């Protein structure tokens, strides 16, 4: 089977557009979202996002929302090498950190990417959530890392990686040590490099489905790849983030009629 035909069949299973569909609104709308006060608790919390702005309507009425509870019994297996389906090429980049008041975000310089079914997505940034946003059979993890990518046509792909309490994580500590404490500030450190590949789990088995951004405006048709194997961070490292952001995770959303595929 040709790579193009394989990609067409896989994306059809996921219920996503096959070729040429731009998700550029997913990229530009979060900038507009900054002008609307939203958060994770109270009257600006997730259950009210759809009421805060017409731009946020999908947060309330969308049918392909993220995160979801990944129910293993309902997942469809694809017996294809996950390493062939999802290929990453992440290079070290100068550390550029932002504390935007919602999370800690690391912006990435051009040149790093992933390929999903032979479609290339450039790594734009990664950020963290506490607790995890996705669940696996109801299991909640301590944190979740999201690596956000965009193709030349504007398509978005996000890789989710669970973090659980365990061994000290030296790459994470580089970020924690440099994180600005004041909200709305950023820091660029040219002589310190960060390498996103250090966050990838040793096993590349992953779940994939068509979802959305997990923050307003909750734009849909985002390709999600959630790694099945968590990585570790020390309890102290998890505690440091949770002190800054006690709760910055959106609750799970209905799966509706979507299909979740596991690449094994």
Curated annotation (Swiss-Prot):
<feature type="domain" description="Alpha-carbonic anhydrase">
    <location>
        <begin position="36"/>
        <end position="264"/>
    </location>
</feature>
<dbReference type="Pfam" id="PF00194">
    <property type="entry name" value="Carb_anhydrase"/>
</dbReference>
<keyword id="KW-0732">Signal</keyword>
<feature type="binding site">
    <location>
        <position position="146"/>
    </location>
    <ligand>
        <name>Zn(2+)</name>
    </ligand>
</feature>
<keyword id="KW-0479">Metal-binding</keyword>
<protein>
    <recommendedName>
        <fullName>Carbonic anhydrase</fullName>
        <ecNumber>4.2.1.1</ecNumber>
    </recommendedName>
</protein>
<keyword id="KW-0456">Lyase</keyword>
<dbReference type="InterPro" id="IPR041891">
    <property type="entry name" value="Alpha_CA_prokaryot-like"/>
</dbReference>
<feature type="binding site">
    <location>
        <position position="129"/>
    </location>
    <ligand>
        <name>Zn(2+)</name>
    </ligand>
</feature>
<feature type="binding site">
    <location>
        <begin position="214"/>
        <end position="215"/>
    </location>
    <ligand>
        <name>substrate</name>
    </ligand>
</feature>
<comment type="function">
    <text>Reversible hydration of carbon dioxide.</text>
</comment>
<dbReference type="InterPro" id="IPR006311">
    <property type="entry name" value="TAT_signal"/>
</dbReference>
<comment type="similarity">
    <text>Belongs to the alpha-carbonic anhydrase family.</text>
</comment>
<dbReference type="InterPro" id="IPR036398">
    <property type="entry name" value="CA_dom_sf"/>
</dbReference>
<keyword id="KW-0862">Zinc</keyword>
<dbReference type="GO" id="GO:0008270">
    <property type="term" value="F:zinc ion binding"/>
</dbReference>
<dbReference type="InterPro" id="IPR018338">
    <property type="entry name" value="Carbonic_anhydrase_a-class_CS"/>
</dbReference>
<dbReference type="InterPro" id="IPR023561">
    <property type="entry name" value="Carbonic_anhydrase_a-class"/>
</dbReference>
<feature type="signal peptide" description="Tat-type signal">
    <location>
        <begin position="1"/>
        <end position="33"/>
    </location>
</feature>
<dbReference type="InterPro" id="IPR001148">
    <property type="entry name" value="CA_dom"/>
</dbReference>
<feature type="binding site">
    <location>
        <position position="127"/>
    </location>
    <ligand>
        <name>Zn(2+)</name>
    </ligand>
</feature>
<dbReference type="GO" id="GO:0004089">
    <property type="term" value="F:carbonate dehydratase activity"/>
</dbReference>
């Amino acid at each position: 089977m040709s790579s193009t035909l394989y990609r067409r069949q896989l994306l059809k299973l996921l219920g996503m557009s096959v070729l040429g569909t731009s998700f550029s609104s997913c990229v530009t709308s979060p900038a507009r979202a900054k002008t609307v006060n939203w958060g994770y608790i109270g009257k600006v919390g997730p259950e009210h996002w759809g009421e805060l702005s017409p731009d946020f309507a999908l947060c309330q009425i969308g049918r392909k929302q993220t995160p979801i509870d990944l129910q293993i019994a309902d997942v469809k297996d694809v017996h294809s090498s996950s390493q062939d389906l999802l290929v990453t090429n992440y290079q070290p980049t100068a550390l550029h950190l932002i504390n935007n008041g919602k999370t800690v975000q690391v912006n990435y310089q051009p040149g790093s990417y992933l390929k999903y079914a032979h479609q290339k997505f450039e790594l734009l940034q990664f950020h963290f959530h506490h607790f995890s946003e996705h669940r696996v059979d109801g299991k909640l993890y301590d944190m979740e890392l999201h690596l956000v990518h965009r193709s030349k046509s504007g398509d978005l792909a996000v890789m989710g990686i669970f973090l659980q309490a365990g061994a000290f994580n030296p790459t994470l500590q580089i970020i924690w040590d440099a994180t600005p404490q004041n909200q709305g500030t950023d820091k660029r450190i040219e002589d310190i490099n960060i390498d996103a590949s250090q966050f990838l789990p040793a096993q590349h088995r992953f779940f994939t489905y068509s979802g959305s951004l997990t923050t307003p405006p909750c734009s849909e048709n985002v390709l999600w790849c959630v790694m099945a194997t968590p990585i570790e961070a020390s309890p102290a490292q998890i505690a440091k983030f949770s002190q800054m952001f006690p709760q910055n995770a959106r609750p799970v959303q209905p799966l509706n009629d979507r299909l979740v595929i596991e690449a094994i």
